[in-house]
C-alpha cells in the first residue's frame, strides 16, 4: 500500500473507533488496540477520573470506563484529521454534561493516535482540562 493509501486507512480506522465509541461497542473498541497499547489522559489521575497513563488492553478498558462514567457527551464534532505516516491527529469539539454533578461542559480537543500493523498502539488526549474539572467539581 502506498503511503497516502496507508494514511487514508489510518484515518478510516480512527473514524471507526469514534463510531464504535458513540454506540458504546466496547468489544469493537478493544479489538482495535494492541495488547501493549498505552493511553495518556489529559491530566494526572486524581485531577480527572480518566487522567493518567493506562497500559495494555486492561488499561484501555479502564480509561474508557472512567470516561463513560464521568461524561455524557451531547455534541461531539470531529472537525479535522491530520495524518502523517502512522499518526492521526484529530481536532474536535465536545459539549455535554458531567454525570456526577449534572453540570454542563464544553471543550475543544486534540487526540493523537499512533497506529502499527492495523492496531492502535498509543493514544494521547489534549483538551480544556480546567473546564472539565470545573464541571465535575462537587
PLM region spans:
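Low-complexity, intrinsically disordered terminal/linker segments enriched in charged
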Residues: 122-138
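Hydrophobic/aromatic beta-strand elements that line small-molecule binding cavities or substrate pockets
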Residues: 76-81, 95-96, 108-114
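A short hydrophobic beta-strand element
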Residues: 85-94
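A solvent-exposed, acidic/Ser-Thr-rich amphipathic alpha-helical stretch
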Residues: 34-85
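Short, low-complexity N-terminal intrinsically disordered segments enriched in polar/charged residues
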Residues: 1-35, 137-138
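Hydrophobic pocket/interface hotspot
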Residues: 14-17, 29-30, 37, 56, ...
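Short loop/turn motifs at secondary-structure junctions and domain boundaries
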Residues: 72, 103-105
Amino acid at each position: 500500500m502506498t503511503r497516502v493509501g496507508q494514511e487514508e486507512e489510518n484515518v478510516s480506522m480512527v473514524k471507526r473507533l469514534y463510531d464504535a465509541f458513540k454506540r458504546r461497542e466496547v468489544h469493537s473498541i478493544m479489538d482495535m488496540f494492541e495488547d501493549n497499547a498505552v493511553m495518556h489522559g489529559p491530566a494526572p489521575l486524581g485531577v480527572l477520573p480518566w487522567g493518567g497513563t493506562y497500559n495494555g488492553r486492561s488499561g484501555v478498558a479502564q480509561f474508557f470506563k472512567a470516561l463513560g462514567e464521568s461524561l455524557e457527551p451531547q455534541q461531539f464534532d470531529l472537525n479535522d484529521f491530520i495524518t502523517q505516516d502512522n499518526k492521526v491527529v484529530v481536532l474536535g469539539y465536545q459539549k455535554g454534561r458531567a454525570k456526577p454533578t449534572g453540570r454542563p461542559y464544553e471543550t475543544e480537543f486534540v487526540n493523537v493516535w499512533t497506529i502499527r500493523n492495523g492496531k492502535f498502539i498509543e493514544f494521547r488526549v489534549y483538551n480544556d482540562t480546567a473546564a472539565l474539572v470545573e464541571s465535575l467539581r462537587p
